Amino acid sequence: MATIFSRIIAGEIPCYKVADNEKFFAFLDINPLVKGHTLVVPKQEVDYIFDLSDEDLAAMHVFAKKVALAVGKAFPCKKVGEAVLGLEVPHAHIHLIPMQNEKDMFFSNPKLKLTDEEFKAVAEAIRAAF
């Protein structure tokens, strides 16, 4: 059975897409810690990020870097943090989170509740920053 991320990539479930290429897909986290919280996933369905080939793992991080630079331009911050957890969804993914301080990376923090229009504006701001 396809993961929720595979269904998002296939267009079966809507998302706020930020970027993609032939191997990777970036979209806004639907339960963001802060505005600009973005997920980067491989289009190949792989549960554990370290099960990716060395080539694909490196390419995923290069793609994530491009997305992170756009996130940082769209949402000025001290740094864009990167986290790999992967326990909730069995599909490898990288969280990119604009940070003013390390507390912005605490996944136990309350999640933002954004409207559809706010999500669209966030995604557009990141896309425009590429």
PLM regions and their residue ranges:
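HIT superfamily nucleotide-processing domains
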Residues: 1-130
